[in-house]
Each structure stands twice: as C-alpha cells, then as structure tokens.
C-alpha cells in the first residue's frame, strides 16, 4: 500500500534484510519477538549489540536489550514495555509505528526538526489494485493488503496495552508515555512535586505523598510556591477537555472542530493563568555558606579592575534549541548508567554572593602587609608649556614659611589621598629593589595642567633632591635608561606619613649652613663643574621629569646649558639661607647628609626615606622656564618581603632601627599568602534565570504537543479513510519527532544546570580547604583534621559527578557528529545520483552515429596534414 505506513514498512524490510529469523510482514506481530528492533540497531551500529547471540524464543530479553540500547546509546525514549510485548500476541500497531518512526528519524535525518517518513505526494491518488509504493518491491503488495485502512481502528477497539500510570492510575496515551525504571508514567506525573521540573533517573527521591517525587537539585533552591502544583492542575484541566472533545466527536462529527478549539482555548487560558508567574526568584544562599568563618583570610583580588567589576560576565548567547538537537540525551537515561548519585546542595551564584564579595574590601585585609606586588612606573605625561606648575607652588611654600609648617598644617586639613592599588599594571622599570613599604594608603601621581596645591605624599622632604652618586650602584647606570627609581621604606604603623615627614624635616635642618663632611668628593667635583646659575631648585614632593628629556646622565656629562632658576626658586633658596654656597644643590646635599651622618641608604627608625635619584641627577635639572615640566608624584612601590635584599651600604645600626619600624611578619614563609578563590564563570555559563525560562517554554510546548497528540491518537484509533489516515500519520510522526527533540533539549538543560552547580560547589570546597591548609599544622585541632577529611571526600565526590556528566555529554556530542557524517554522506549520494541523471540526459541529446562521424572526420584531417606539408 502507498502512504507513510507502506514507506515505513518498506524501510524496515530493507534494514532487516539478511538477518536470521527476521521476517517483516507487518508493523505489529513481526516486531513482537524483538529481533526486528535488534536487527535495525545492528545494521547501523553493530558495535552496540551481538545479534548472533540472540534467540527468537527469548522475547523479553530481546525487547529489553533493544529498548535499553536505543535509550542509553541513541537517546530514543522507550515507548514500549517488554512485558507488554510478551503478554500480547499482537502488539499495538500504532505504538510500533511510533517507536519505529523514531528509529527512522534517527538513522536517516537526525537533527532535522521537520523530518518524517517520505510521503509519495501531497494529495495521494485513490487506491487501486495495481497501485504500489515506489519503494515496495513487487512481492510486497499482497503483504501490504493486510494493513487495511481500518486496521488501526480494529486495534483501537481491542484491549489496549497495559498503559496505566504508576502514579495516578489513569490511562497513558502514546504521546504521554514516560518509562522510568521499568514503570510507566505520564510525563506530567513524573515531575518534582515542588519545582515541577522533569526528573532525571538517579537524582530524585520519594515525595511526601505516595506516588510523588522530589528532585535533589532545583526544589531545594526555589522559594515555596514558585512553581509547585501548577503544572499538575493544568494537566488535570486539560484531560477532561480532551475527553469532552472525544465524546462530542463520537456523537456529532461536526462538533469535533469546536470541541478541539474549546480545549485549546482552555489550555491557553490555563497556561496564562498558571505560567505567568513562573519566573523563579533568585535562589537564596544556603546558611552554612553565607559567610566565611571568622578566622578565614579574605580572598584578594588579582587586579584593581576585578575589585570593582563584581558582577559575573555576560554569557555568550545561545540558541533556544541549538539546531533542535545539539546534544541528544534522553530524560529517562541515567548519568552514565546510574553512576551519578544525589549531589550535595550546591552554593548558588546570585545577588547575595555579590553583596558578600563587596563587603570584603571595606577593611584592610591581613594579607596587605604580607605580600605586595611591585608596581611599574608609567612615563610622566607631557605638561603644557604655560603655567608655573606645582614646582613654583612648592617654592612659594618654602618662601612663605617653610615646608615644615605647611606639612604640619596639611596633615590635619587636607583630605587623605586616594588609596593606591598595589596590583595596578604599569610599565616595566629598571633598577635594584629597595626596602618595601607595605602601606595600602599611598597616593598615585595626579598630574594637573593648571597650578594646583601640592598633593600630599608619604615622602615629601627637601632631601629628595639629594644626588644619588653616594650609592655605589648608581655610578654605573647606563645613559640609555630614562627611568628613575624611587622607593620609600616602611613607615611606622602608628604615625601618619605627613607627621613623619614633618618631624623628619625639623630634625634634618641644622642651624648652620655649612656643608657636612659626609659629602662625597665625586658629587662636589661634579657640582663645581656646573656652578654657573644651574643650581638645582628645591624639590617638591616629586622628582621633576620630562617625557622628552632623559633623567639619567653619566657623571661626567654636562647638563643642559643656558637654564636659569625661576625667581620663585631663587627667593626660596635665599630665604633658607643657602645662597652662600657655590651651588644650591650642594647646600641641599650638605644639609641632608649632615643630619644623616653616613652614606647609608636606609632611613631613620619610623621615618619614610627619600627616594633615590640616579647618578645623572647630580647635574642640573631640565630647564624650568622654557619647558615648565610638571612634577609627578609617584606612590611608593611594593615588593614581596620574602624577596627583600638588604642594601650593601647600610650600616648595622640603621638596619636594626629600620627593623623596629616594620609591621609584624608572618610566622613562616609557607603560610599567610593571599587566598584567591577560583572563578567558575565561563563563557558557556548560562544564568539560572535563563535556564528556568527556557525550561518553562519547553514545558509549555510539550504540553501543547501532548494535547494535540492525544486528540490525534484518538482520531487514528477511531478510524478514517485511507487518504486522511495517511495525512494524520504524517502529522503524527512529525509530532512525535518534535516532542523527542524538546525532551532532549530539556534533558540537556537539566545536565547543564547540575554541572554549573557542581562546579560552583567545587570552587567553594576548594577555597575552604585552602583556608584550612593555609593554617600552620601545629595550630590544627581535631576538628580541623576531621573537617579536612570531610572536605577531601566531598571534593572527590564532586569531581566524580562532574566527570560523569561531562562524559555523558561528550558521548552525546560524538554520537551526534557521527550521525551528521552519515547524513552528509547520504546527501552527497543523492546529489551524485542527481548529477548522474543530469549527465545521462545531456548525453541523450547526442546521437551515437553523429559522434562517431565527427571523430572520424577529425582523424582524417590529422592524417592528411603531414602529406600536405610534404
């Protein structure tokens, strides 16, 4: 016979051809022993089962093997029960057709949403004794006559297979069948009682009432009443509507359309009423994970940008169905043969987590004094050519009353500068590391194009202009290095930086202006060679530096000539009583070295040292009047205290004094490092709200398909003429295939949801374990050791569960790739056949005699050509 049934029957015969004991006569009793299912599976996937070991008499095992292999390996849900195949002498024809159609769709057009068995034409011709299907062989016509148009109606009048739901006891239609652990359910009955999500084998438990279930993943994370019970009530209202439509159709066929429309209207109204508020709220964080223990260190941000960008990154958009079959996964299939157990309740990510993370940087964490990364130096921006800049402002401060009073006054009046982030990335710098400063409140440079009051700095002092020729390392500095190195030492914990500089300034100014004998001969000789009005002005809290002129010079290289000191600089130097010296720079050097009394680069106890200049800074500074360079204040750099190298020129007494001012060091280098929590937000991360929304959309589509499928099944079993039955069968196969794709997508979303939760929980367990291991082992208690064992065991369980999900999804992807290759090969074969047919048509236009005459004429012309030449 022609039509979808005949085409499906012919396809089954071709697949089972040559297999022992398999004879496909119809789509009912021929499949009872299960060998036909196994033969189709073995034809396409011989690696899945051994067909030679099967016996025709073992009906139950054959069917069980075929159904389990198709469900676990191919993602085809089992619509049939092996017990029904044993108990019934003639299985239900519509059930067999529906199940075999999924084999057909899987092996011929996998991934195509609208795929269905081939239909001869849109309007099939009326049946005639001689009409046969193109795919049916000559001997198949008599066998196809057994499948009369009313065969489905006859089977519908017979006793249907055991289709009672194990949960509610009502009849289960084919489109509603859901087999789980050997029991038959309605799809809407096999749901979580609280969150109404489809259950996955191995991840649910019995509910409070008999026949109900509770999932171990979502219901514990959703608020009460968010999605509970609404789906069941909707289904209960839809079933009477379908029954009323069926009764009305039996009584009066003209009322069937109105009944279907009424049922659809009731379904739509129930969906609007019950599914509008189904957007679940953000899950709340479990109480035991809400806040870290009191003794746990606060996780440190890697960069400054990460501390401000606390919101999770926006995930990549992905399509709703990903071509209707990205991952083929059956809902009823377990996670790798049931290896996945109930995972612990994972820690959700959401708004509470962000608030918790935002509260951490408000206080100074303990690790800020332990390890500080060394920032790199940025080049100073090019200042404008007009305006005196901060340099003359600093000189006016000395002229009006000295830097000491201004510093003391600003310590109580000026606002505290912006905290400097030690993790900010800057350019690579050169130089030997100096003593670090673990101070988290150092201000970065704030260049300003207009005159502004000087920014308070942890290291403003007149002695910053001291030449660094005294240090033995700076005499060999190459001339190509334009960078300067400025590193203050640690400050006293109890004193503010400005108060320290004020006290130091008062101690470092001797009453006499005579140079100190500690002044080096090298610096005096170099300064005497450049004494012609090139005295370096008193430095404000920053070292003058131009982006165009390098700040490093060879000691013998003369400075820039023709530069004069600004009037403000002269007045400030004269008011300080230092104009009697040959050079203002010598006087500054003498005054500073007179107070220090040594060549040590270490500062006094409790004081912040002045940053060192390179050897070239003994020469005059760049021109101030012509270029007007802005002075740039640079915050002190930080380094790891465990990589500290003492200066070789530091005296033991100064070194001891500096140690007294350091903060308390950690007990051992192995403990106390900052613990950074691993981020788990990947590009493939899907927010929970999106997962919930897509699953709700899928459930609504499944409800609509099931409602249409119940009505269509009743029509098919009720009987119809051959033409309308063929059309209904095509619609039926398409409906089953669409439902199968939606179920696979829903199963994939459930696995993605579980995978993300397990990954988040693993990150939490790892961080808690690191915090525990970060504690010295001598301070461990019995409770800590027991907690370590529990965390290690939980970590191993989480890893195994994640591995099971990943392996399951990978197998689905590999299977889908193989199916895509098969489909591509089939398409290529069809294209090749079309090309061959077109070539044969083109060849038919030429007659053989004409071609032979044409070739003979060409040969004669070639043979005559040499004779003509001769």
Swiss-Prot record:
Could you confirm whether the keyword Transmembrane helix appears in this record?
no
Instruction: List modified residues, type Phosphoserine.
Output: 291, 305, 480-481, 494, 496, 628, 747
Q: Write the protein's name.
A: MICAL-like protein 1
Domain text from the record? Probably exists in a closed and an opened conformation due to interaction of the C-terminal RAB-binding domain (RBD), also described as bivalent Mical/EHBP Rab binding (bMERB) domain, with the N-terminal calponin-homology (CH) domain. The conformational change is regulated by RAB13 and may modulate MICALL1 interactions with functional partners.
**Coiled-coil region(s) at which residues?**
689-722, 806-840
Keyword flag Lyase: no
- In its UniProt entry, the species of origin is given as Mus musculus (Mouse)
Q: Where is this motif: NPF1?
A: 421-423
Q: Which PANTHER family match?
A: CALPONIN HOMOLOGY DOMAIN-CONTAINING PROTEIN DDB_G0272472-RELATED (PTHR23167), MICAL-LIKE PROTEIN 1 (PTHR23167:SF89)
Basic and acidic residues bias locations: 354-365
Q: Where in the cell is it found?
A: Recycling endosome membrane; Late endosome membrane; Cell junction, Adherens junction; Cell projection, Cilium membrane
A Pfam cross-reference name: bMERB_dom
Q: How is the quaternary structure described?
A: Homooligomer. Interacts (via NPF1 motif) with EHD1 (via EH domain); the interaction is direct and probably recruits EHD1 to membranes. Interacts with EHD3 (via EH domain). Interacts with RAB35 (GTP-bound form); the interaction is direct and probably recruits MICALL1 to membranes. Interacts with ACAP2; the interaction is indirect through RAB35. Interacts with RAB8A (GTP-bound form); regulates RAB8A association with recycling endosomes. Interacts with RAB13 (GTP-bound form). Interacts with ARF6 (GTP-bound form). Interacts with PACSIN2 (via the SH3 domain). Interacts with DPYSL2.
One GO cellular-component annotation of the UniProt record comes to: late endosome membrane
Key words of the record: Cell junction, Cell membrane, Cell projection, Coiled coil, Cytoplasm, Cytoskeleton, Endocytosis, Endosome, LIM domain, Membrane, Metal-binding, Phosphoprotein, Protein transport, Transport, Zinc
Principal location listed in the UniProt entry: membrane
Q: Where is the Calponin-homology (CH) domain?
A: 2-108
What residue intervals hold the motif NPF2? 640-642
Q: How does it sit in the membrane?
A: Peripheral membrane protein
User: Acidic residues bias: where?
Assistant: 423-432
Q: What's one GO MF term for it?
A: identical protein binding
Q: Composition bias, kind Polar residues: at what positions?
A: 150-162, 227-239, 267-276, 306-335, 558-570
What spans are recorded as compositionally biased (Pro residues)? 117-129, 433-461
Region Disordered, as annotated, extends over 110-164, 224-253, 267-674
Q: Name its GO BP terms in alphabetical order.
A: cell migration involved in sprouting angiogenesis; cilium assembly; endocytic recycling; endocytosis; neuron projection development; plasma membrane tubulation; protein localization to cilium; protein localization to endosome
Q: Where is this region: Necessary and sufficient to associate with tubular recycling endosome membranes, mediate phosphatidic acid-binding and membrane tubulation?
A: 707-870
